[in-house]
């Protein structure tokens, strides 16, 4: 992998920025590297919360920043790798997040359970007509209302993507659509070939899965398959379609970053030479 090659050659540590790899025991469906595959390179922000809990980007940002300071203190280089657009941006751009209130959140969760998330969605749009969110995105709707009630302000986040913290070097890995489609299809096939269904079965025996874990791409489909709601073929197809949508969303997100280095990964060996050149110049290594 390109990140492992870079960390190996530049005395680096990997700091995970994939929100789903934060969860313990969710390995196959998140494409988490095994310990042996990590080649002895230190990895951070992996397996840090149970699937029964809910990840928080605000908590993640603070933890990741602490990791980065620790890595710098070791005279090593942190490689933030991922992943989830908001999680990456939270660190790279030092985003500030509104406060939380567990009491308000609980009231909203209970109301959504009783009356349906559509009621809360309608209320949110009445309060802030310009806010855009899918009617079925329960977590984001509840968080938006929580922010609106606590602060009295619009829940729309302001993402200062022109301002970068900590002198990050941003390398955006791209490839043509045909190559991407093939890679995504192979990725999804590997999930099921490597035992995603069994992994989900064990997760259900060990944990009461939280909303995020239960709705994760691949895991949601495996849960539906185990419940007899869909066939294995339909589970695979749905996983692939959601994976493609997520990839397209990530492409659009990272395209907005200013001052980024774009590297075509169609040929991985060529791509790594470009990455090495970028890092050599940035670190002034001859």
UniProtKB/Swiss-Prot annotation:
HAMAP family linked to this entry: IPP_trans
Report keywords, A-Z: ATP-binding, Magnesium, Nucleotide-binding, Transferase, tRNA processing
Segment Interaction with substrate tRNA: which positions? 18-21
Record's family?
Answer: Belongs to the IPP transferase family.
- Pfam families, alphabetized: IPPT (PF01715)
Answer whether the UniProt record assigns the keyword rRNA-binding to this protein.
no
Q: Which GO terms describe its biological process?
A: tRNA modification
Alphabetized Gene3D superfamilies for the sequence: 1.10.20.140, P-loop containing nucleotide triphosphate hydrolases
Q: Which cofactor is recorded for it?
A: Mg(2+)
Tell me the SUPFAM superfamilies matching this sequence.
P-loop containing nucleoside triphosphate hydrolases
Q: What is its EC number?
A: 2.5.1.75
Its quaternary organisation is:
Monomer.
Catalytic reaction(s) noted? adenosine(37) in tRNA + dimethylallyl diphosphate = N(6)-dimethylallyladenosine(37) in tRNA + diphosphate
The keyword Transferase is annotated on this UniProt entry: yes
Q: Where is this site: Interaction with substrate tRNA?
A: 84, 105
Name of the protein in question: tRNA dimethylallyltransferase
Q: What does this protein do?
A: Catalyzes the transfer of a dimethylallyl group onto the adenine at position 37 in tRNAs that read codons beginning with uridine, leading to the formation of N6-(dimethylallyl)adenosine (i(6)A).
Q: Which species? A: Tropheryma whipplei (strain TW08/27)
Q: What class of enzyme is it?
A: transferase
